[in-house]
Swiss-Prot record:
Residues 123-135 have a biased composition (Basic and acidic residues). Residues 108-135 are annotated as: Disordered. This is Small ribosomal subunit protein uS12. It comes from Helicobacter pylori (strain ATCC 700392 / 26695). Disulfide bonds: none annotated. It holds the Pfam family Ribosom_S12_S23.
Length: 135
């Protein structure tokens, strides 16, 4: 425990919190342009073809971001909205693309967790048709 005189001579060190998404520069989301859209394979125990995109953000950072959901309409030069959030089994992927914003379409025929995938609510007639199929 330091004395008062020691604290006057040299103050306590501030703990600097390191951000997990530095490319967003203190913003919740950033706009960017896709420079490359491709698939990649996850780390060891998992096996899949994960859809990712290399995005040039307005903050001048070039980041790799994950495209969530089934199917997408992204290609080179698409304007996308990027949020933070890593993908545990993809090394170097620390960002997610927001579905249903800017050039990114929402996921088709999605009924649960729609807000996460940018899908509009189904019409009442469509809902009745899907209910009849379940029975």
């Amino acid at each position: 425990m330091p004395t008062i005189n020691q604290l006057i001579r040299k103050e306590r060190k501030k703990v600097v919190k390191k951000t997990k998404s530095p490319a967003l520069v203190e913003c919740p989301q950033r706009r960017g342009v896709c420079t490359r859209v491709y698939t990649t394979t996850p780390k060891k125990p998992n096996s899949a073809l994960r859809k990712v995109a290399k995005v040039r953000l307005t903050s001048k950072f070039e980041v790799i971001s994950y495209i969530p959901g089934e199917g997408h309409n992204l290609q080179e030069h698409s304007i996308v909205l990027v949020r933070g959030g890593r993908v545990k089994d993809l090394p170097g992927v620390k960002y997610h693309i927001v579905r249903g914003a800017l050039d990114t379409a929402g996921v088709n025929k999605r009924t649960v967790s729609r807000s996460k995938y940018g899908t509009k609510k189904a019409k009442a007639t469509d809902k009745k048709a899907t209910d009849n199929k379940k029975k």
